[in-house]
């Protein structure tokens, strides 16, 4: 490292110490941001701290997938650095590496792995500097239009990021035509994964891309999993879902959650692993599959996969589950129509009768909340005995949307009121 890089590292350490010791705060992205003010190219130097690395991006599932990869790699005996808190812009990646650099240096070469969640629009800043060995592309849906714009802009950014890191292997969800079209246009080596066969779940009314990326003709589907995900082909030019190199098969939903097989090859003789989850959302099948296919590419033995999932603790706001007054209470996070529709489907599958919907418009959430009119709340409107609440900074907007869906929702001020309603209902 040169003098500027050393000064940036020292300044970051001082900032982190001050935030934690004096202000009693975790620090977040501030240490990384301070370091980058001094040395904007610091990430290029820090990249040498790890022997292999993977960057994970996509509209939904980044935090879950990256944390599962990190857990699986750690279980295999490697030293792992991961931005687990979801600080997924360049300062967050820099901050994670700075905080872990002493441990990475002690670990020595060969077993140091970086696992980094990255915001879609920041991939073009992170990939050229980090030059990860692998890049996982989960899905692309409409998300925060006031910041992201249209999906084709996000596609352009991700494709350009990959072009600037040509040695990076792309691991992508081939069931999503938006992801497959990126893979088709970049020079990177790629690994296509997806669900091999129909799961016969209830598909959404939302579709972000059912048009061919090559000729713009409408795509035809042999089956749809949800959103635009499924087995597609273009009747006009012949473009179709790529052959799956990594496959998810035998997907079954039980009372306990989804179970499925991961097949690490394209033929019947390929190694496989059976996975049982405690989640009833099909989106988690994709997240777990992406995580474990990536972990396998990083050298993780299949024997570590199920124990990793069994021990997994979701990040704050995601898939939290508690027992309150004899009732199972689940909390989840959705930031776009398809993600929200997946939660609606989970509510319907689980038979949930008391629902509290909190809608916020903070900068991190996006100020444009019109997307809630694309969420299929009508799907649960006929639930017998349904009790609904609306909260958050845009509680009244949520209440109106629910009213249009035929759902009467009372306004509540905080989560405590919702928990109180659970206790009252159980009494």
Enumerate the predicted regions with their spans:
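Short active-site oxyanion
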Residues: 111-114, 166-170, 327-329, 382-389
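Gly/charged, well-structured mid-domain segments that form the phosphate/adenylate-handling core
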Residues: 239, 253-255, 294-330, 334
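Phosphate-binding loop of NTP-binding sites
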Residues: 3-194, 201-211
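Acidic-glycine-rich active-site phosphate/pyrophosphate-binding loop
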Residues: 66-75, 252-271
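Short, conserved loop/helix-junction motifs that constitute active-site signature segments
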Residues: 128-131, 161-166, 183-187, 349-351, ...
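Active-site beta-alpha connecting loops in nucleotide-dependent enzymes
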Residues: 315, 333-415
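Cys/His-rich short segments
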Residues: 196-257, 278
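A conserved, hydrophobic alpha-helical segment in the catalytic core
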Residues: 129-139, 228-243, 273-310
